[in-house]
Regions:
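A conserved active-site-flanking secondary-structure segment within enzyme catalytic domains
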Residues: 154-180
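Extended, subdomain-level signal for the structured scaffold at the beginning of enzyme domains
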Residues: 4-137, 145-148, 166, 179, ...
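A short beta-strand/loop micro-motif in the catalytic core of glycosyltransferases
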Residues: 137-138, 158
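Short acidic alpha-helix initiation/capping motifs at coil-to-helix transition points
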Residues: 194-198
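Residues that mark the start of a beta-strand
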Residues: 33-35, 157, 188
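Conserved Rossmann-fold dehydrogenase catalytic segment
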Residues: 178-193, 223-227
Length: 239
């Protein structure tokens, strides 16, 4: 005897849950301010990033000046890890996001700025593109190597971390690289020795833009004694 029954297919009651990534949130930028972009990557050194970031961010507390929007730019949406282990989520990804016009580009030093980072064509291309419209491009410590590799310092005097000056002169023998100064300002380029002296280079740019009184107020807010005349530096006067 053959029995014919109703054979219904078992329904798959399991539910697959798709991972939904949260929508990326970008900084709210005040259009009346300078846009200051900090180029960061794995191995960035804390001080060269946070020193100028602190100075520039504090401009929003000064009255009657064109203050600064500060934000970070990297080649990833994931966090980057600084040399000292601090994890930072970049505000913008220059490989995929629409980057706002950057008025001041800051290139802090990173662990591989003397080797593998100099072969990063996408990063160098971003720097060159940003340089075209930027009012200032600044570097701290070995960030100068990146600017040099991008060709930005070909016609400019510069400096870098004191113990790396000879290395930079060897790698870029046609450049005029100064020693025994904490920063050099030549045209739109400001290069600094880095380390804790990154504060001085950032304060100098603020004094250049806003005047001595504002620079001293910014310095005082971070308990820094500021007197440009006491800082070893070079300013190249353009004819």
């Amino acid at each position: 005897m053959v029995s014919c029954g109703n054979h219904s297919e078992e329904k798959n009651t399991s539910t697959e849950i798709e991972e939904v990534k949260p929508q990326k949130e970008f900084p709210v930028l005040d259009s009346s301010r300078y846009n200051v972009g900090f180029l960061i990557m794995d191995g960035v050194f804390n001080t060269e990033l946070t020193a100028p970031f602190d100075i520039f961010q504090h401009t929003i507390f000064r009255k009657n000046i064109k203050a600064m929007n500060v934000f970070t730019v990297a080649n990833t949406d994931d966090y980057i890890t600084s040399f000292e282990g601090m994890k930072i989520i970049p505000d913008y990804n220059y490989l995929s996001d629409s980057i706002p016009k950057i008025d001041i580009l800051v290139v802090p030093s990173a662990e591989h700025h003397l080797d593998s980072d100099l072969e990063d064509e996408a990063m160098l291309s971003f720097i060159k593109k940003t340089d075209r419209d930027a009012q200032f491009v600044t570097s701290h410590c070995d960030g100068a190597f990146v600017l040099a590799k991008a060709g930005l310092l070909n016609e400019s005097v510069s400096t870098t971390f004191p113990s790396d000056i000879n290395t930079m002169r060897t790698m870029f023998p046609t450049l005029d690289i100064r020693k025994e100064v904490l920063f050099v300002h030549d045209g739109k380029y400001i290069t600094s020795a880095g380390g804790a002296k990154s504060f001085e280079a950032a304060l100098y740019l603020c004094e250049f833009l806003y005047g001595k009184e504002i620079a001293q107020e910014l310095a005082g807010g971070l308990v820094i004694d500021w007197n440009l005349n006491e800082i070893p530096h070079t300013i190249i006067e353009k004819k």
